[in-house]
């Protein structure tokens, strides 16, 4: 398998799609699949499928294809989805509640271990067995579970845009090195560095994924203009 830093982001995104396709094939009791079949279902070319998979190992047999269950298992392992990832959610409004209540995350070893907010009418409520804590308790909570099976790996931000950067900095200061940001603002990652006490040797970078569903709608709007799309007349 190639080093993580050498694998293009777009490739990782497509591999996530391949895993979904493989799951669908398994549900249909399909035992083997060709790169052509995977490509057709994923909306890419067979060459692209084969190229993407070479980053993660050697799979399949020419003329026979891939064993669906084996390829799915190996891709899950390659993406680290064969191990548990503990998650805290910061911001328990409607979106935070929806994510906390979503059962599918646990299928991929993502476990919610902490919920946080600042609103007095929200703090203290219970969601799926977890009590929502005040944001001021984030650091002590993360420290209290460090080195245990409940150690926090990722933070999900579902806070208003104006509070996102500060919330991200609070997560990083507590030692959380991965952030999935649902707030409608791009986090300034140059300001996010893990404290030396929490960072691996030679690595203090924080991994941030910004999720913007409106971006998808904007792209869709453009493509729906059709082939005649062009600059507006002045």
From Swiss-Prot:
Family: Belongs to the transcriptional regulatory Rex family.
Positions of the DNA-binding region: 17-56
Binding positions for NAD(+) per the UniProt entry: 91-96
Gene source species: Deinococcus radiodurans (strain ATCC 13939 / DSM 20539 / JCM 16871 / CCUG 27074 / LMG 4051 / NBRC 15346 / NCIMB 9279 / VKM B-1422 / R1)
Subunit structure, interactors included: Homodimer.
UniProt-recorded name of the protein: Redox-sensing transcriptional repressor Rex
GO molecular function: DNA binding; DNA-binding transcription factor activity
Entries under Pfam families matching the protein: CoA_binding, Put_DNA-bind_N
Gene name, Swiss-Prot/TrEMBL: rex
